[in-house]
Amino acid sequence: MLTNHSVGSTRPSRVMTESAMDAEFFGAPAWAWVQLCAAVFAISTAGVMFQQLPHVPPLLLASWRMQATALLLAFGAAREWRVADGDVRARWFKTWPRLGFSGVCLGAHFGAWVAGLQTTTLARSLLLVCTTPLFLAFGALALCLPTSAGELAGAALGFCGVAMVASDRHDGERETATWQGDVLSLGAAFYIVGYMIVGADVRRWMPLCLYAGPVTAVAALSTATLSYLVEDTEGSGGVLGWAFSGVSSYFLVTMYLALVPGLVGHTGYNAVLKHISPLVVSTSLTMEPLLGSALGYAVGLADAPGWRTGVGGIVIVASVVTVIVAKGRNPR
């Protein structure tokens, strides 16, 4: 039985914990940085999991991932809609064109990336899909948006790091690099820019699932439609094959992709965009090649990384720290 003294003693501890998580570090709450770290680790497993189903057409596989994630997000979106006030609901309806655009960008990102994963090495695909900070940084310059020199330098440093990882053993016993796969992966990095910019803006007032749910549903619909038109979907059970084909690996891999890289990873990124700049969030993705390549080697899908991967990984981490510190010193 808890005495009054013991109950009272637990309250300061709880308050101190909550205060610590709400404390700001480099211009954002501590919990946002913790969630960002969890998202990085979660999303780093996606490449390996996509490669568990190499015979499923890429657009179809991307659509499966989006379908499962959209179903999970629907529960949160319904709850947020019930408690939303009239102003939020009205603004949400007016934002639909932008949500649709964001969803198409997200679908294009995953479709191109899965195709890249299936046609080039894991390390190269992971590094090229993480060059988004360059598109954001130089896009900000072109549009005359406020971006600090430190953020730009960190983004460029991150590119140098992932370039070193990419230069390490292009071909090996298990993998072969192709320029087609490289171009697809680079295209995936470009397509996600629209998704991140829209999210950074509307997430300032829109609840998380009311944004991520519809956007993911649009991504699922767009990739499923394109897959049906240009791919042989029947061999994998059709557009809904992950749920109704009877192949357990289809269901298990798809649900993992939805729960871990999907909810913990990409939805986690959306959650912190309200507090952390898109350039910082996207630059954190530059850790994915190192983590994803190491995981691929550990499970026997990728070749052993060499010294360039080690040095490149150090450069990548340094670039992340550079951008975070620069953002904290130059809050916008």
Residue map of PLM features:
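Glycine-/small-residue-enriched transmembrane alpha-helix faces in small-molecule transporters
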Residues: M1-S63, G76, V104, A108, ...
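Hydrophobic transmembrane alpha-helices of multi-pass small-molecule transport proteins
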Residues: L2, T10, L73, A77, ...
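C-terminal-most transmembrane helix of multi-pass membrane proteins
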Residues: M21, M66, S167, G235-L240, ...
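Specific transmembrane alpha-helical segments of multi-pass solute transporters/efflux pumps
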Residues: A42, G47, A74, A78-V129, ...
